[in-house]
Amino acid sequence: MNIKKIGLTALAGALVSVSANAAELSVTGGASIGFAGEEKQSTGNGWTMNDGITFSASAEMDNGWNVSTSMLIDSSDTAASYGIDNRSLTIDMGDSGSLTFYGDGGSASTALMDDTTPTAGEEAWDDVTDATAHSYSVASGDRDWFQYTNSSLMDGVTIKLDYNPSDGATTIESSTSGTITYTGVDGLTLGAGMGEDNGEAPTTVDVSAFNATYAMDAFTVGWSTYEEDTSASSGDVTLTAMGLSYAVSDDLSVSVNQATHEIQGSSDQDSFGVSASLVMGSMTLSANHNSVENVAGISGTDRSGYALGLSFAF
């Protein structure tokens, strides 16, 4: 991805309220078109398009810290989703870590651990309507929350801590989550995370996640487990997933993935998927086919779905 950078000395004071010699502005973007379909399910027009442009600015303070801000202008398939997303302000304090405030968007650290198995396309349960998925996130619609990151405490160790304050309305209590990742052994990645979501009052959701990924030559294998434990009488879900990817060349990758959702009071949802992706410069072609048994825990409800994608980065 090519990034155009422009020195903007005159705008440094306007971008951040600190003393800085110069600010650096970068603009990146992307666009994609896709087609998806399903068996035993009416999906209507399967064609979709997405695009977005990200504006970022950064400057170095007199004490050596770096301050940056970023925002995404994106357009999805519905007019209600048009606008600015992922607005953030980050203070990088060097060995003391970095603190990011998300005015809108962002991803809680545990949300990125929902299924970490290697794939050339999508997770095994994706592209099938009503299939149970996992995507834990801090409450309040991902607005006005904090994330702290530090990778300097120990070689190969990165920690992330999330805090979402209560808003006195939909979120009566604050929500917290955190993860730790270890990459100190060549090719091996280990991760663990936990969190508490109090944004669904009076119900609370406790989340825990563990994963391991190992890459050797052209092969990458991964295992992931993710559990949601709700204070309600039902609704607990545990995901266990495995995946294997193979880099046929520098440009072509293929993968197979399997996932099982254990749903409290329902049948287990079992998913199996195959994916492939081909990268040619800034263009990526992707394809995947997934089959899901007992969709959403409903016994005998079996469906499959597929997706084709073409994306460009600039």
Please provide the spans of the model-predicted regions.
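Outer-membrane beta-barrel proteins
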Residues: 1-314
